[in-house]
Amino acid sequence: MPASVLPLIEAAAHWPERGALVGLDLGTKTIGVAVSDPDRRLATGVETLQRKTFTADAARLLAIAGERNAAGFVLGLPINMDGSEGPRAQSTRAFARNLARLTDLAIGLWDERLSTVAVERELIGMDMSRAKRAKVIDEHAAIFILQGALDRLAVLRRTSKAN
């Protein structure tokens, strides 16, 4: 059965209580990949995937998910600052729909506004050269996106347990 592509909170209802999540920062040339621990506390980088074809990209992402026994995916959705969705967001949604046809793992969409800007500032602060930043920025953006989603899910879990 194909997976669902949903906003993060709705997708979380489809995920088991435990299990790693795979975070993705989708670019036109690369895909940054991060993964969480099974308790969903910490995101760590996995790789920056050089995009080839959708079939090849999806096969690699599904292999990573399988290797990590992932419970689902978190895909950064590039929403404009005014809240609208432009061509990049539409392309991301299309990628998510196509990936969902190949897996039963629910895909959660998470607002990634300013993630690359924040990561670039952090890497500049670490005095990393432009060439080195270019090699790691997408993977670090995937970490940033996934960690933001994990933090939001943790707040929701604490809130629901308190009620």
Curated annotation (Swiss-Prot):
EC number annotated for this UniProt entry: 3.1.-.-
InterPro entries: RNaseH-like_sf (IPR012337), YqgF (IPR005227), YqgF/RNaseH-like_dom (IPR006641), YqgF/RNaseH-like_dom_sf (IPR037027)
Enzyme class: hydrolase
GO molecular function: nuclease activity
Superkingdom to which the source organism belongs: Bacteria
Pfam families (UniProt xref): RuvX
Name of the protein in question: Putative pre-16S rRNA nuclease
Keywords: Cytoplasm, Hydrolase, Nuclease, Ribosome biogenesis
Upper taxonomic lineage: Bacteria, Pseudomonadati, Pseudomonadota, Alphaproteobacteria, Hyphomicrobiales
Keyword Hydrolase belongs to the record: yes
Biological process (GO), any one: rRNA 5'-end processing
Homology family: Belongs to the YqgF nuclease family.
Function (record text): Could be a nuclease involved in processing of the 5'-end of pre-16S rRNA.
Localization in the cell: Cytoplasm
Claim: Nucleus is one of the keywords in the record: no
One Gene Ontology cellular component: cytosol
